[in-house]
Regions:
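Flexible "cap/lid" loop of the alpha/beta hydrolase fold
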Residues: 104-109, 113-147
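Active-site glycine-rich loops that stabilize anionic/oxyanionic intermediates
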Residues: 30-34, 97
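The conserved beta1-alpha1 loop
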Residues: 28-30, 214
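Active-site loop/oxyanion-hole signature of alpha/beta-hydrolase fold enzymes
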Residues: 3-17, 36, 40-46, 52-94, ...
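Gly/Ala-rich beta-loop-alpha elbow adjacent to hydrolase catalytic centers
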Residues: 95, 99, 103
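Conserved alpha/beta-hydrolase catalytic His-Asp/Glu region
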Residues: 129-134, 147-204
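Conserved loop-alpha-helix segment in the C-terminal half of the alpha/beta-hydrolase fold
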Residues: 43, 207-249, 260
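Post-His helix in hydrolase/transferase enzymes
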Residues: 255-269
Length: 276
C-alpha cells in the first residue's frame, strides 16, 4: 500500500508509515488477520503520526515464538524487543480483537513504554488453566483450519466479520486475504494464547489512558460483551466512561470503518490525562 514501507526487525515483519509524533502508533492485529488489516486506517491517519503495524510472531514474515503455547506476556516481550530495535521508547498501542490481549499485557508488564491504549473489538480471552484442554471454540477453529486449509477456511468465515457483507464485498475480500495468508504454526500458537489469556486481569492494572470501541453489528465480540471489558479498566484511566460504538460496522472495524478508526487513534494520541 502506498506510503507504507515493509521492514523486518528483531524477527518481526511489519509495515511502517513515517511521521514525527513523539509517541508512534503501534498496531496489533487479530487472530485471523495480518499487518495489512490496518493499511487503510494507517493511510487515513493525519500526516504527523508515525505508525507501525506488525505481523505478530508466526504470522506473515515474522518468526514464530520458541514455545508451543506462548502466553500474552510472551507476545508482549516480542513487541518490546521490536520497540527496542526500532528505537521507540513510548508508544500508543492500538489492538484489534486478539491483538488487544497483547496490548493489555504490554501495558501491564511495561507501563513506562505505553502512553495510551486503543482497544478495538476487544476479546476477553478464555482464561483456561495451562492444564485444561483448549476451549471448544478455540479447538474448533484450529481443527477447521487444519482440515480445510487456509484458503477454504478464509472463504467460509470472512463474511461473518463484516456488517452487511453482500454490500461490502471489497471488505470481505480484504478480510479473506488476511485469513488465507495464515500459517499453521503461528495460528496454533495464537490459539493457545487466546485460550489461556484473560484481559480483565491485565486491564485492572492499566496505568494509562484507555479507549475501547466496537462495531455496532460485531458478531464476534458484540457490544454487550465488550461492555464488561470496559468495566475492567480503572475508571480514572478511561478516556470515555463507556465504549465507543461504531455504527454499521462488524468485527473487522479497521477494515470496514478505517476513517472512523483513524479518528479514534487521533483522539487517543491527543488525549491529555487530567492532573492527579
Amino acid at each position: 500500500m502506498s506510503g507504507l514501507a515493509q521492514i523486518h526487525r528483531a524477527g518481526i515483519a511489519a509495515l511502517e508509515r513515517p511521521g514525527n509524533e513523539p509517541a508512534p502508533v503501534i498496531c496489533l492485529h487479530g487472530f485471523g488477520s495480518h499487518a495489512l488489516s490496518y493499511g487503510a486506517m494507517m493511510a487515513a491517519l493525519r500526516p504527523d503520526l508515525r505508525a507501525l503495524s506488525w505481523d505478530m510472531p508466526g504470522y506473515g514474515g515474522s518468526d514464530a515464538l520458541g514455545m508451543a503455547e506462548p502466553s500474552a506476556s510472551d507476545y508482549a516481550a516480542a513487541l518490546r524487543r521490536l520497540l527496542d530495535t526500532s528505537g521507540l521508547q513510548q508508544v500508543v498501542l492500538v489492538g484489534h480483537s486478539l491483538g488487544t490481549l497483547i496490548a493489555a499485557a504490554m501495558a501491564r508488564l511495561y507501563p513506562e513504554r505505553v502512553k495510551a491504549l486503543l482497544l478495538l473489538s476487544p476479546t476477553a480471552g478464555f482464561g483456561a488453566a495451562p492444564s485444561d484442554p483448549l476451549p471448544d471454540v478455540v479447538a474448533g477453529r484450529l481443527n477447521a483450519f487444519a482440515a480445510e486449509g487456509a484458503a477454504a477456511y478464509a472463504k467460509a468465515r470472512a463474511a461473518n466479520l463484516v456488517y452487511d457483507p453482500s454490500r461490502h464485498g471489497d471488505v470481505v475480500a480484504s478480510v479473506a486475504r488476511g485469513m488465507a495468508a495464515l500459517r499453521a504454526d503461528g495460528f496454533a500458537q495464537a490459539g493457545a494464547m487466546l485460550a489461556r489469556a484473560r484481559i480483565f486481569d491485565d486491564l485492572a492494572e492499566v496505568q494509562c489512558p484507555t479507549l475501547v470501541a466496537v462495531g455496532a453489528q460485531d458478531k464476534v465480540t458484540p457490544p454487550e460483551k465488550v461492555a464488561m471489558i470496559v468495566d475492567a479498566v480503572p475508571s480514572h484511566w478511561r478516556i470515555e466512561a463507556s465504549m465507543v460504538v461504531v455504527p454499521e460496522c462488524g468485527h473487522a472495524l479497521t477494515q470496514q470503518r478505517p476513517l472512523e478508526a483513524a479518528k479514534l487513534v487521533a483522539d487517543v494520541v491527543d488525549f491529555q490525562a487530567p492532573s492527579p
